[in-house]
């Protein structure tokens, strides 16, 4: 809340990240919300889940920015590594590497797909996330409720970011716009794999052609 108010007032320079921000004590989550918040307080929140039927969106004040290999967690200082990476030695390597790269007052979660990646690849992903954070800070200046200060990538690129792995050898779509979108994103994050994107032009429906209809 303090950070959001500073950004709205223009008292925080985006390029400083959180270097000069004085971290606050952790809020006791079993306490009474009235002891922490008052009416008309301005909060920086992130949507965790879109609204469904009569239920509104699920929100959190614990902001996180997901990248290809890393997740940036502001107002934190720890580095966690996915336990799905089997090798203890590799987990240790990644932890030490990311600890040397991360900015002050930011935590980082190392995703499973980061296994085997070098310092340059991880650093580039981290810089991309830092740029997103700085963009959000710039958008906060002068913002009034309710303002969207940062947009997540669309569903297509979000799925690719989370699921694309070295085992992928083909991505097929019958939509020209979608094919271009996927190819552009893969060219950005894994240029060596851009040729796996193919556009289906057959007369048989694409789901029937690949036997997907039977599975659903």
Residue ranges and their predicted role:
Residues 1-216:
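DE-rich acidic low-complexity regions and acidic surface loops
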């Amino acid at each position: 809340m303090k950070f959001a108010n500073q950004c709205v007032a223009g008292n925080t320079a985006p390029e400083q990240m959180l270097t000069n921000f004085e971290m606050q004590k952790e809020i006791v989550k079993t306490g009474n919300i009235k002891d922490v918040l008052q009416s008309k307080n301005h909060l920086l929140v992130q949507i965790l889940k879109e609204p469904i039927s009569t239920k509104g969106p699920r929100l959190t004040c614990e902001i996180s920015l997901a990248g290809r290999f890393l997740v940036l967690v502001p107002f934190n200082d720890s580095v966690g590594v996915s336990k799905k990476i089997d090798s203890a030695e590799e987990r240790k390597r990644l932890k030490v590497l990311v600890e040397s790269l991360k900015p002050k007052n930011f935590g980082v979660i190392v995703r499973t797909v980061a296994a085997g990646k070098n310092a340059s690849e991880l650093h580039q992903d981290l810089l991309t996330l830092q740029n997103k954070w700085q963009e959000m800070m710039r958008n906060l200046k002068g913002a009034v409720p309710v303002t969207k200060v940062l947009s997540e990538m669309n569903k297509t690129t979000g799925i690719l970011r989370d699921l694309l792995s070295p085992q992928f050898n083909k991505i097929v779509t019958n939509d020209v716009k979608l094919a271009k979108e996927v190819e552009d994103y893969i060219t950005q994050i894994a240029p060596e794999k851009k040729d796996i994107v193919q556009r289906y032009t057959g007369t048989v429906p694409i789901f029937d052609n690949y036997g997907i209809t039977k599975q659903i």
